[in-house]
Design a protein with these regions (language model features):
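Acidic, metal-coordinating helix/loop segments flanking the phosphotransfer/catalytic sites
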Residues: 6, 31-49
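Two-component/phosphorelay signaling modules centered on CheY-like receiver
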Residues: 3, 11-30
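Short amphipathic alpha-helix used as the core "switch/output" element in two-component signaling
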Residues: 40, 62-76, 93
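His-Asp phosphorelay/catalytic-motif detector in bacterial-type signaling
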Residues: 2, 46-48, 72-78
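C-terminal output helix
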Residues: 87-89, 103, 107-116
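Active-site residues of response regulator receiver
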Residues: 9, 53-55
């Protein structure tokens, strides 16, 4: 069974691009445009990984706040933060809040796939 990855980004083109890359590699993806949609998806089914944009414009919660909420609900879910506006302080804050890793946009598909594989290693070993 394919690992389930939830992609949370306010930019539809980024969601579609990331989901497409992951689908092509055999992952099962779901997408969410904002925090409430992401929380509904989490409640419906636990993902193997969440790819989460830091800013989430127009959302009730930004990415770091949503990261807090995800970790409150299930600390074992790995979360890979994505940002086009990130800096070292944002990356450090995300890691301190429990993110597995941090990747800046734009990124190469190979780099994304490497980080996804690393973040889901424990989940794969459980199967």
């Amino acid at each position: 069974m394919a690992l389930d990855i939830l992609v949370v980004d306010d930019e539809e083109d980024i969601r579609d691009l990331v989901a497409g890359v992951l689908d092509d590699e055999g992952y099962q993806t779901r997408t969410a445009a904002h925090a409430d949609e992401a929380l509904e998806a989490l409640a419906a089914r636990r993902p193997s990984l969440v790819l989460l944009d830091v800013w989430l414009q127009g959302s009730r919660l930004d990415g770091l706040e949503l990261l807090d909420e995800i970790k409150k609900r299930d600390p074992s879910i790995p979360v890979l933060m994505i940002s086009g506006h990130g800096n070292i302080d944002t990356a450090v804050a995300a890691i301190r809040k429990g993110a597995t890793d941090f990747i800046e946009k734009p990124f190469e598909a190979d780099r994304l796939l490497h980080l996804v594989a690393r973040a889901t290693e424990t989940e794969r070993l459980r199967r």
